[in-house]
């Protein structure tokens, strides 16, 4: 289990209404990044991951399935060059990467509901990112970036300037069934 944001990421591909998407999710904050793909080759996935890493930083580890995009020599060389520990789920039991599979279903539901309502799916994604995980826990965005994001919802300026969430003051749990201890020793929290 990760002990701070962006330490461990999950990555998967999925199809929605004939389009291919790349979903990258931080295991700690549950922050999802969604990218629509023109191609699902290793080279295309690597370019999207490079773009994400250039913006958010490089994770220590990346969990994927054993799809051809991730099992190529090109992908192995990329992970090695960028210093990323590439972890694959069991080819005999793909559900072993349950976290990312659940997030794929969550994001697919956001896309379906947005389509049905004729709404912008990226606003739905923003809403998901900025909704508190639990009544005592901050949003994925706040856990990851230590700030509240501005959204379409009216909000006082005071709330936009709120203090950063402190990991050491919370019993934040990624998966309550497998982890019940407090997060401490986070070098990324002020």
Regions found by a protein language model. Give the residues of each.
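Short, charged, surface-exposed loops that flank catalytic or proteolytic processing sites
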Residues: 113-123
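Retroviral integrase
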Residues: 1-109, 134-144, 148-190
């Amino acid at each position: 289990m990760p002990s701070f944001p962006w330490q461990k990421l999950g990555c998967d591909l999925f199809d929605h209404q004939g389009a291919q998407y790349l979903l990258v999710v931080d295991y700690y904050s549950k922050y999802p990044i969604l990218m629509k793909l023109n191609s699902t080759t290793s080279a295309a996935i690597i370019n999207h991951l490079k773009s994400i890493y250039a913006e958010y930083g490089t994770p220590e580890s990346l969990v994927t399935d054993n799809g051809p995009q991730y099992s190529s020599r090109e992908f192995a060389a990329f992970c090695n060059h960028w210093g990323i520990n590439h972890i694959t789920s069991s080819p005999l039991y793909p559900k072993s990467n349950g976290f990312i599979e659940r997030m794929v279903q969550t994001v697919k539901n956001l896309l379906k509901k947005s389509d049905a309502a004729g709404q912008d799916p990226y606003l739905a994604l923003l809403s998901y990112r900025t909704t508190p995980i639990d009544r005592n826990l901050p949003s994925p965005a706040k856990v990851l970036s230590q700030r509240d994001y501005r959204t379409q919802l009216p909000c006082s300026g005071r709330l936009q300037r709120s203090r950063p969430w402190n990991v050491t003051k919370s019993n934040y749990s990624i998966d309550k069934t497998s982890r019940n201890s407090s997060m401490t020793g986070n070098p990324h929290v002020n």
